[in-house]
Amino acid sequence: MPTVEELYRNYGILADATEQVGQHKDAYQVILDGVKGGTKEKRLAAQFIPKFFKHFPELADSAINAQLDLCEDEDVSIRRQAIKELPQFATGENLPRVADILTQLLQTDDSAEFNLVNNALLSIFKMDAKGTLGGLFSQILQGEDIVRERAIKFLSTKLKTLPDEVLTKEVEELILTESKKVLEDVTGEEFVLFMKILSGLKSLQTVSGRQQLVELVAEQADLEQTFNPSDPDCVDRLLQCTRQAVPLFSKNVHSTRFVTYFCEQVLPNLGTLTTPVEGLDIQLEVLKLLAEMSSFCGDMEKLETNLRKLFDKLLEYMPLPPEEAENGENAGNEEPKLQFSYVECLLYSFHQLGRKLPDFLTAKLNAEKLKDFKIRLQYFARGLQVYIRQLRLALQGKTGEALKTEENKIKVVALKITNNINVLIKDLFHIPPSYKSTVTLSWKPVQKVEIGQKRASEDTTSGSPPKKSSAGPKRDARQIYNPPSGKYSSNLGNFNYERSLQGK
């Protein structure tokens, strides 16, 4: 093993040789042997090996292996020095191997070391993006779980920081191709991260790019399979996939496949859905997703059949007044509960799809069925008016901080929900029923559109989902509020707001 003095002497030989460096193979070999020495020798070797690496292609394997030994040394300062110099080895055919090594080194728990690995990966990314991706995806597909997890997170956080000259169209195509391989077997969280990666790619922000992403999500959602409402994994997969698809839909990228699947497979099983996460109102969650998608549904093969399924489900949440109930169960003083949150979603979805078959209520339903529906609408509208008056009175004069209390936030959302339902019911009371009104769903931010300005939706929307979806159902950007459905205003004649919030 060479001493510190011998290392310096051989370094001098190589440094003085200028253009004839490659003739001093023995001197470079001495430096390579420095990795077998003590702390001082290793530290010098970590600096000297990369400095002259390019002059000795025949010793490339030995040099990379020597540096790799130093990257795994027990001394953290030696590891850091060795990692810092790794990009100097990333030349030609060696680059994918260096990328592979750096990807494996992402598993370190030392924060300074981890940052060095990230910086080194970014450095070689700028030298050869395709080669670096080869190393990263190799570990994602075949590496240990911790390496796979961190490599995916590296891509999801760092790709967007790279300039366009690095992320060329060819590079983005490679990312898409390799991602498709990974998506054949991913966890829920990994799927969300890959959708974030892919939807952020410039080449996939066109109409055709968005369509490709929707098809990827549809494949992941397994829309060809029969839905199993009692399997929490099946339910969770559908929810996660649909959440990723929703921000991709636009007037040019249709949600038809998803809406059809929800109408045919999910709505009939709404009451038997198994929630994948404790505390989640799974039925309301499904109905909200359906409502959001319904705006972008294209031509549907079985429109009348699916509209009828949606209509029948809506009727379940729009009760007859007590005196009109056929079985008498609701007779007497007890008023049926009005589940405003559910009705907003179902009525909105029906209103959106109804536009495609405007004579559904008048030509497709028999007179008795239509009369029954009008009675239910009228009863619900009456309850709405009572509730809206109560809410407006409760919020009257409140501004700024006063509106930020938890109680008032609930009232504000409740007012949005009831106003939306009110507008939609008025449309359906028209003769013939109208489908012209536009409302913003209560949990969605109101979009202000300047006159003459295009809505910033369609093909330029940011690819990353507006929700920070984790493996579970939590979502950030939506600021989703689950009102205590079924607990809002029960007794129309004797309204008690505070009691309606019990159980929240």
Curated annotation (Swiss-Prot):
Region entry Disordered, spans: 452-504
An individual GO BP term: apoptotic process
Any one GO cellular component localisation term in the record: cytoplasm
Leucine-zipper, as annotated region: 370-391
Coiled coil residues, start to end: none
Phosphothreonine PTM positions: 399
Gene Ontology terms, MF aspect: fibroblast growth factor binding; RNA binding
Compositionally skewed regions (Low complexity) per UniProt: 462-472
Polar residues: bias regions: 487-504
Post-translational modification: Acetylation at Lys-251 impairs antiapoptotic function.
Region of interest called ARM-like and Heat-like helical repeats, as start-end residue ranges on this chain: 1-360
Keyword terms of this UniProt record: Acetylation, Apoptosis, Cytoplasm, Nucleus, Phosphoprotein, Repeat
Record-linked InterPro entries: API5, ARM-like, ARM-type_fold
Modified sites of kind Phosphoserine: 462, 464, 469
Positions carrying N6-acetyllysine: 251
Location in the cell: Nucleus; Cytoplasm
Short sequence motif named Nuclear localization signal, residue ranges: 454-475
Pfam families: API5
Family according to the record: Belongs to the API5 family.
Function: Antiapoptotic factor that may have a role in protein assembly. Negatively regulates ACIN1. By binding to ACIN1, it suppresses ACIN1 cleavage from CASP3 and ACIN1-mediated DNA fragmentation. Also known to efficiently suppress E2F1-induced apoptosis.
Quaternary state and interactors: Monomer. Interacts with FGF2 and ACIN1.
Protein name: Apoptosis inhibitor 5
Species name: Pongo abelii (Sumatran orangutan)
Lineage: Eukaryota, Metazoa, Chordata, Craniata, Vertebrata
Gene: API5
